[in-house]
Regions:
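N-terminal subdomain of nucleotide-sugar transferases
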Residues: 1-68, 250-253
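Membrane-proximal helix-turn-helix segments that form the acceptor-binding/catalytic region
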Residues: 36-38, 134-138, 152-154, 164-187
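A short, active-site helix/loop in glycosyltransferases that binds the activated sugar's phosphate group
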Residues: 55, 62-64, 170-205, 212-214, ...
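Nucleotide-sugar-dependent
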Residues: 243, 293-295, 305-326, 335-346
């Protein structure tokens, strides 16, 4: 068996270069960590694999400074090779360039008619799946499994995507992706309910929930915002109303303990709202976008981490927030609402408010932060243990590999 992992990860050797050439110096940290978790799992399971990456970047000249994304090749282990394709980043030409290079690299790999090839695609982007579908048509020994982390319909939740003409192109992309589902042999989902929106996945899916990728975090950042005489809550994620951060900030503002601090990392349409609240309440610290390593350090040093998303939108039934695994693995206790996409067993390790009101969240903040330090430490450690032992890269990728061979 040979595995080809089609991804959008950033090779570590050129990650700095890619970040520097993004107009906003912003790389997609959460998807990158998930994908490197898959790669490390393939390495640990000693699988013969090609990691084929088309780094997730914006187009030139609006979002990326270079006309062409540089190629990079490396050997990650005896069995695993990495090819990060170089492609044309110019707006309008990018999809065709990526599609052509994907097809070229995969066709060069699937040369043995007696070998079974399993392509695991992290993305459902249509121009990344299109060349695989064409290759499958002429190679009976090539099989396609797709990791679905989010439903394509969710793209329209972001305000920037709701404007014309972007909305038109996104709707067309959604239609194309749904047509491509019929060509996918197996689906790897983060929530069992996703099959309600992807009927093609019924009877041929594996629910993964998430993956804990043990990052090599160096204590390279001075955490001056976290002090031993203060109780710090951390939120790191998208700064959008649907994420619940606006309401959580309002709930925090209703608390009065001067030793409380709320650190917020991220970017999005609610930044102006958060910045205004930070002016009104000096306990709120808005950091904006931050490097992933810095965020991980903050998670481990904070008193409490929070996912403030509420179950008042359909998306929460069909998703498993990536931060859940990362937060619970940090050893820091977590507070959040009951979301349908998260199995009930996770909530034994979390604090949850009594209802969805801002007042209830404010009361829960006071309740949790009033608990003795040893109770909070015990809560965090009990949550951490099963994540690190059962959701680590080797275990989760092992499940995927067994599923592919069923």
């Amino acid at each position: 068996m040979k595995v080809i992992f089609l991804s959008g990860l950033y090779p570590k050797a050129i990650e700095g270069l890619l970040s520097e050439n993004c107009r906003n110096n912003y790389l997609q940290n959460a998807p990158n960590e998930f994908q490197w978790g898959i790669v490390d799992g393939l390495i640990q399971n000693k699988v013969s694999a090609l990691i084929l990456s088309c780094p997730f970047l914006g187009t030139y000249p609006l979002h990326f400074k270079l006309r062409r994304v540089p190629e990079y090749r490396a050997s990650l282990s005896k069995e695993v090779q990495l090819v990060s394709i170089g492609y044309n980043a110019i707006m309008g030409l990018k999809p065709l360039s990526i599609e052509r290079h994907i097809r070229k690299e995969i066709e060069a790999c699937v040369t043995d008619d007696n070998e079974e090839y399993f392509i695991i695609a992290y993305s459902t982007i249509s121009y990344m799946l299109a060349p695989i579908i064409k290759i499958k048509a002429s190679h009976q020994n090539v099989h396609l499994a797709t990791i679905v982390t989010d439903l394509v319909d969710n793209a329209l939740l972001f305000k920037d995507n709701q404007k014309y003409p972007k909305r038109f192109f996104i709707n067309r992309e959604i239609e194309t992706i749904k047509e491509q589902y019929s060509y996918i042999d197996k689906f790897i989902l983060l929530s069992a309910a996703m099959t309600e929106k992807i009927p093609a996945a019924i009877g041929k899916n594996k629910v993964l929930e998430g993956i804990w990728h043990e990052s090599d975090i160096q204590a390279s950042h001075n955490l001056t915002d976290i002090k031993s005489d203060q109780k710090t809550i951390l939120y790191a994620g998208t700064i959008q109303p649907f994420a619940g951060i606006n309401d959580f900030v309002d709930a925090f503002a209703k608390t009065s303990n001067p030793s409380y601090r709320l650190i917020i990392c991220g970017a999005g349409s609610s930044e102006a709202y958060i910045q205004q609240k930070a002016k009104e309440d000096s306990r709120i610290i808005f950091k904006g976008r931050q490097p992933h390593q810095y965020v991980i350090q903050l998670q481990r040093a904070a008193t409490l981490v929070v996912n403030p998303r509420k179950p008042d939108e359909e998306i929460t039934r069909y998703s498993f927030p990536s931060k859940t695994i990362e937060y619970l693995a940090s050893g820091t206790p977590m507070i959040g609402y009951h979301l349908e996409g998260i199995p009930s067993e996770y909530y034994t390790h979390m604090f949850t408010p009594t209802d969805l009101s801002i007042e209830a969240m404010a009361q829960e903040i006071d309740h949790v932060l009033s608990l003795p330090t040893h109770i909070l430490k015990e809560k965090g450690e009990k949550a951490q243990a099963p994540i690190q032992s059962e959701k680590n890269s080797k275990a989760q990728v092992g499940k995927i590999l067994r599923f592919l061979q069923e």
